[in-house]
Amino acid sequence: MKETPGRNFRNHQKKYFKAYLAFLVFCICFIARLLSGQPGNAENQYPDTGKTREISVKASAIPEYSGEPYIILEGNTPDFTDNDLTEKSFENYSELDSLGRCGEAFSCVGQELMPDEERGSIGHIKPSGWHTVKYDTVEGKYLYNRCHLIGYQLTAENSNKQNLITGTRYMNQNMIPFENETADYIKETGNHVLYRVTPVFEGENLLAKGVRMEAYSVEDDGEGVCFHVFVYNVQPGISLDYATGKSRLD
C-alpha cells in the first residue's frame, strides 16, 4: 500500500525523535563523565605509582636558616590530596635530573615495606654535591652523610641512588626524629602512613637547601602521624657553597 503524505511525515517524526533521544542521552553521559573527573568510582582510584608528579617547592619561598634545625610549613598540614589516600602500600622515586639530582620520594608506608635485615654499605654512592671532608667541630668528623630521603627503616631502600642526597650531619640527625615517629606508629598499629620527602634545590645548585618532609596516617585520618616541615641542610660553624658542595670553617 502506498504511504500517504501524512503517514510518511509521522514516520519521519518518529525517526527524528528517536535520534534526538539518543543524542540527548549521549550528551548527559558525556557531561557526567567530565564532571566526575574520573572514568570510574573515585573511591577506588589509587596513586599512579609508575610516574612521579611534579610538586612545586621553590627555594626562594623557604626562609633562610635562623638557628632552628627545621620550620613548620602550612600549619603542619601536608599537601596530600584525597586521591593520594590509600591503604595500599607503594613507593615511588623520581628519576635523577640532568645534574644528577634527586627529586621527590613518595610512599605509602606499611609494615610490608619495612626491612627485615640490617642495612648494607652505601659508600660507593656519590650523590650530587658530594665531597668527603672532615671537621673537628662536626660530630663524627665527617661533614656530609648520604641521606636517605625516605629512611631505610621505612621502605628498606638502601643503595637506591634516587633516594640518596648529600646532606650535612646536622640535617641527617634532625630528619631522624620524624622518621622514628612514623616507624614507631606503623609498628605499633599496623596502619599505613603517606610519606613524602622532597629535596629543594635553588637554581642549578648541586647541594640541596634542605628537604620538605610530609606524613599523614591514613586509617585514623592523621590522628597518629601528621606533619609538614622543612629541615635545613646546614652545619653550624661551617659555610657551604650550595652550587658545588664545597665548604669551609666560618
Predicted segments, located by residue:
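Domain-level detector of nuclease and nuclease-like folds
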Residues: 80, 84-250
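Intrinsic structural disorder/low-complexity segments
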Residues: 15-16, 41, 151
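N-terminal, intrinsically disordered, polar/charged segments of Gram-positive cell-envelope systems
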Residues: 37-89
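Intrinsically disordered, low-complexity segments enriched in glycine/proline and serine/threonine
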Residues: 5-6, 21, 41
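N-terminal Lys/Arg-rich, disordered targeting/topogenic segments
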Residues: 1-17
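Hydrophobic membrane-insertion alpha-helices, especially the h-region
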Residues: 19-34
